[in-house]
Every structure is written in structure tokens, then in C-alpha cells.
């Protein structure tokens, strides 16, 4: 059918991925100004924490939030044209994206309504994350194929661990951790979305390699049937993220909000689960891990000694307090994120 219509190229994953990426990017450029204007008219402005860097209270006041809406709109419209909508992995990732985005949307809305940075009750927020991660990981466990409960370790050719049904709580931990660490990192113009572009780009490569029997056999990594549609999904996410960065780069015209940050983190975590890259993901998302550890260390040490290890947490604020400009922090963190990604990808061959 495709051949008769002269659409043979639609059989190729690389072609569909390329155009899903370009399409999502162009949609973001076209609809970005309209969405920013609409959010401003609705007075959906970013609510800033009073305990953050003082200059943020003046520089970032009045910037519209909930920018995740722009990303997901562009991604979903693009995917409608380029992806197999009934692929099981796509449906699971789609559920994760929508459910965590709704949770983040509620959080953003409450912050704006109450005019403070508290948002959802922390207990309700974590319960929501537990519920959505439990549903999605359980779906993955039962519909994800024979390899799904096996964990593969970087650097080791034959070292693997089959968790069985315990993979469900393990996967939930990955999902919730990824979601919250991304949320913590979203504190400077372009920081979180730039780092997510690096992680997403690396996952595109991994997804493509695992979808091909020849590459998977050569690299001694699992061949995951159906993961080729994840290449297209990640491509669209990459394009939407680049489009969002166009408006989120310093000085930002729009902020991602929890609508975007909670969801993108969870989506990347779920993608890592599907691609059997759970341990590799910890290396790939190294900057996000460091940001989260800085908060955990800061809180734990302060509770015990009443002293601070960092001038301010998360880690990006520590460097701001040391005198780095916002753009210096962002670009240097991007560079570090890229190094982590290169290390992670290199482990595919070092086995």
C-alpha cells in the first residue's frame, strides 16, 4: 500500500523519527508565542520560593508557568502522524506522560491559586506518584515481554539479575525518583530542559540499537521487539523540548512548571525501564542524581548538626551563591550532562 502510494519511506524508523522531531519542533515555534500570551492573559505566572536566591524574586517574577503544556501538545500532535498509535510501549509511556502531567498541573494550579510555592500537599503528591507509577510499571511487567523483569549491568557481559515480581516496586522507585529529580533540577532558565535533551538524545540512540537485532547482538544488549516506536516517541519529545528551549533559554519567556518537569522525568524513567537501561540511566542522568543527592545531604546534615554542606540546595543554587552567573551554571551543567551521556553510551561497547 505504502509502496503503491510512493510512501515507502514511511517504513523506515529513521525517516519517521527525523520528521517527528522536526514536526514537533516547528509546532513549538509556531504555537509557542500563542501559548505564552494565553498563559499571561490567564495570569498563570510562576510562583517563586522565598527561600531561593533573592535575585530570582525580581528577575523571574511574572513569567508564565505550565510550559509543559506546550511540549506535550507538540509531541502528541506530531506523534499522531508518525507513530504506531497501538504499540504497547507507546501506550504505557503515553499513560505516564499524561498522568504525571495532570498531577503537575494540579500542583501548579494550587500554587497560583494560593499565591505561594507550596502547591499540592506533599503526601497527596507522593501518593499520586505511587499510584500512577504502580499502574504503569504493572502494565509494563505483564505486557512488556520476556526480558522485562531482568536488570542488566553496565561493563559486565553476562551479569544480570531477574527480579521477578519485585521488578514492580523497583520500577516504581525508578519512576518516582526520575520524576522528582527532574523537578528539583528545574530551577534555572534552560537548565532542566537542556539536560533532558541530552538524556533524551542518548535514549534515542539506545532505543534504536535495542530495536535492531544486528546491533543488539553485536553489542550484547537485549533486542526489544516493538521498541522502534519508542525511537519515534523520543524523537518527538526531543523536537518539542528543543522548541520549548527556544522560549525557555535565558531570559526565559515561559517556565516548564511541575506540569512539564514531573512528567518528563517520569517519561524518561519509564523509557529506561522499557529499554532495560535502568542502571545505565543512573549514569546517563548523572546531573539529576547529583542535584537530588545535594538536597538529601543538605537536609540530613542540617537536621543533625544545624550546619549546611552547601550554601543552598539543590546544587545549581550552590554555584549561584558562589558567584556563577545563571548562564554559566546552565551551560556548565549541560557540559557535565553531555559527559555523563558519553560515558553511559560508551558502556554499551565496554562489556
Swiss-Prot record:
GO terms for cellular component: plasma membrane. Its main location: membrane. Keywords: Cell cycle, Cell division, Cell inner membrane, Cell membrane, Cell shape, Cell wall biogenesis/degradation, Magnesium, Membrane, Metal-binding, Peptidoglycan synthesis, Transferase, Transmembrane, Transmembrane helix. It is a multi-pass membrane protein. This is Phospho-N-acetylmuramoyl-pentapeptide-transferase. It is an enzyme of class 2 (transferase). Catalyzes the initial step of the lipid cycle reactions in the biosynthesis of the cell wall peptidoglycan: transfers peptidoglycan precursor phospho-MurNAc-pentapeptide from UDP-MurNAc-pentapeptide onto the lipid carrier undecaprenyl phosphate, yielding undecaprenyl-pyrophosphoryl-MurNAc-pentapeptide, known as lipid I.
Amino acid at each position: 500500500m505504502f509502496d503503491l502510494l510512493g510512501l515507502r519511506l514511511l517504513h523506515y524508523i529513521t525517516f519517521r523519527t527525523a520528521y517527528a522531531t522536526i514536526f514537533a519542533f516547528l509546532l513549538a515555534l509556531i504555537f509557542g508565542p500563542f501559548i505564552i500570551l494565553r498563559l499571561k492573559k490567564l495570569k498563570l505566572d510562576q510562583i517563586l520560593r522565598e527561600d531561593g536566591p533573592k535575585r530570582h524574586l525580581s528577575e523571574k517574577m511574572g513569567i508564565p508557568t505550565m510550559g509543559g503544556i506546550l511540549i506535550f501538545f507538540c509531541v502528541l500532535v506530531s506523534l499522531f502522524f508518525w507513530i504506531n498509535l497501538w504499540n504497547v510501549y507507546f501506550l504505557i509511556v503515553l499513560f505516564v506522560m499524561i498522568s504525571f502531567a495532570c498531577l503537575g498541573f494540579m500542583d501548579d494550579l494550587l500554587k497560583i491559586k494560593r499565591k505561594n510555592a507550596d502547591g499540592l500537599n506533599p503526601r497527596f503528591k507522593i501518593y499520586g506518584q505511587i499510584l500512577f507509577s504502580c499502574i504503569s510499571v504493572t502494565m509494563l511487567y505483564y505486557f512488556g515481554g520476556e526480558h522485562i523483569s531482568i536488570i542488566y549491568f553496565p561493563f559486565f557481559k553476562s551479569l544480570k539479575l531477574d527480579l521477578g515480581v519485585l521488578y514492580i516496586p523497583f520500577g516504581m522507585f525508578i519512576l518516582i525518583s526520575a520524576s522528582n529529580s527532574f523537578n528539583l533540577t528545574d530551577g534555572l532558565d534552560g537548565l532542566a530542559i537542556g539536560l533532558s535533551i541530552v538524556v533524551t538524545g542518548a535514549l534515542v540512540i539506545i532505543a534504536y540499537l535495542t530495536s535492531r537485532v544486528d546491533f543488539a547482538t553485536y553489542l550484547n544488549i537485549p533486542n526489544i521487539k516493538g521498541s522502534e516506536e519508542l525511537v519515534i516517541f523520543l524523537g518527538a519529545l526531543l523536537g518539542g523540548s528543543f522548541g520549548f528551549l527556544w522560549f525557555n533559554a535565558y531570559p526565559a519567556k515561559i517556565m516548564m512548571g511541575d506540569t512539564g518537569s514531573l512528567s518528563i522525568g517520569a517519561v524518561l524513567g519509564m523509557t529506561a525501564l522499557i529499554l532495560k537501561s535502568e542502571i545505565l540511566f543512573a549514569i546517563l542522568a548523572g546531573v539529576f542524581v547529583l542535584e537530588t543527592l545535594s538536597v538529601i545531604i543538605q537536609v540530613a546534615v542540617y537536621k543533625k548538626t544545624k550546619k549546611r554542606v552547601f550554601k543552598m540546595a539543590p546544587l545549581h543554587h550552590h554555584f549561584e551563591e558562589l558567584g556563577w552567573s545563571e548562564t554559566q551554571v546552565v551551560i556548565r551543567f549541560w557540559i557535565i550532562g553531555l559527559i555523563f551521556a558519553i560515558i553511559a553510551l560508551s558502556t554499551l561497547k565496554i562489556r
